């Protein structure tokens, strides 16, 4: 007997997300996009708290580009097209893990992306992490400063 595996392509709907006291502020803030006062947002919390789900809702609404630890390095291996960066919205998932993976190189890459987007009011960058920016182990003070100056949501 052979077991058949059925692949379903379920589309996530925001009304299926369980909103709690802990995540209601972040959930409501993300839903207000594109009416954000800043282009940089940092969303953090422990694993399984819903930050990936909330950020995926934003990614879909903003038609953004997802940068995970897998495709982050690939994206930066090519020459950066600044116009392309400025004309798209971006989600960097697990910033603290990226920095831990290659502290100096990835810190500089994240800072470059932040600087390009910060100077441009047409693109947004949502970043997620497990830790508050002030607790990220990073030697690049400019990056920590930029993360702390973004809108930080728990």
Predicted regions and their residues:
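A short, basic N-terminal segment
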Residues: 1-32, 37
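Walker A/P-loop nucleotide-binding motif
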Residues: 37-55
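Residue-level preference for the first positions of well-ordered beta-strands
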Residues: 38-42, 63-66, 89-91, 124-126
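Conserved nucleotide-binding/hydrolysis micro-motifs of P-loop NTPases
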Residues: 49, 71-74, 96-97, 131-135
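Short glycine-rich substrate-engagement loop in P-loop NTPases that contacts/grips substrate
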Residues: 59-89, 100-107
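Conserved P-loop NTPase "ATPase switch" module shared by AAA+ and STAND
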Residues: 83-109, 113-116, 120-131
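Short regulatory helix/loop adjacent to the ATP-binding pocket of P-loop NTPases
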Residues: 133-148
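Conserved AAA+ ATPase "SRH/arginine-finger" region at the nucleotide-binding site
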Residues: 150-154
